[in-house]
């Protein structure tokens, strides 16, 4: 029976979600508290990954990161026709390991559209990180945090480049 308890413990650790313990990114720019000359945006985040067991957590990380980094923006979940829409389509957010190194990746596509539905910008944001499996550290979480920070940095740069005339 003791042998089976170790098996269950190993399975629980191996099947844990890579988003666990990852914190939202906060990178506000006092010169650009919101983007595109608008204060309110509709925000739609969809998870297109094959494995979606941690969807609420990952979507929350992305939403919180945008809110903290663009504190002048108000975000609406409902598609209000008078607001532009920022859409994020999540493709990868996870880690793999060979036992010695953790590989983390975050990847999503971003679109910003004006209230008429015209595309203002579209781009891909990716982040990748490798981290040796150090003892006494959650190397999986550290690698995933770095990948999120890189992908969110690209997202913010792309959104902040929006013209204020849109």
Residue ranges and their predicted role:
Residues 17-21, 73, 80-122, 126-138, ...:
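Surface-exposed short loop/turn segments
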Residues 50-56, 114-165:
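Short secondary-structure boundary motifs at beta->alpha junctions and helix caps
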Residues 34-36, 78-82:
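Flexible, charged surface loops at secondary-structure boundaries
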Residues 1-13:
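Sec-dependent bacterial lipoprotein signal peptides
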Residues 75-77, 161:
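Short glycine-aromatic motifs
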Residues 15-68, 160-166:
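A structural "domain/chain start" motif
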């Amino acid at each position: 029976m003791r042998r089976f308890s170790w098996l269950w413990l190993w399975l629980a650790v191996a099947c844990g979600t890579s988003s666990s313990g990852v914190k939202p990114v906060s990178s506000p720019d006092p010169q650009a508290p919101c983007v595109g000359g608008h204060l309110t945006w509709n925000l739609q985040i969809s998870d297109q990954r094959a494995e979606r067991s941690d969807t609420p957590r990952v979507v929350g990380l992305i939403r919180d990161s945008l809110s903290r980094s663009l504190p002048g923006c108000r975000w609406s979940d409902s598609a209000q026709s008078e607001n532009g829409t920022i859409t994020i389509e999540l493709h990868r957010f996870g880690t793999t390991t060979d036992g010695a190194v953790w590989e983390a990746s975050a990847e999503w596509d971003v679109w910003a559209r004006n209230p008429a539905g015209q595309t203002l910008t579209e781009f891909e944001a990716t982040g990748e990180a490798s981290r040796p499996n150090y003892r006494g550290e959650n190397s999986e979480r550290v690698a995933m945090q770095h990948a999120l920070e890189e992908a969110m940095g690209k997202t913010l740069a792309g959104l902040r480049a929006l013209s204020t005339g849109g």
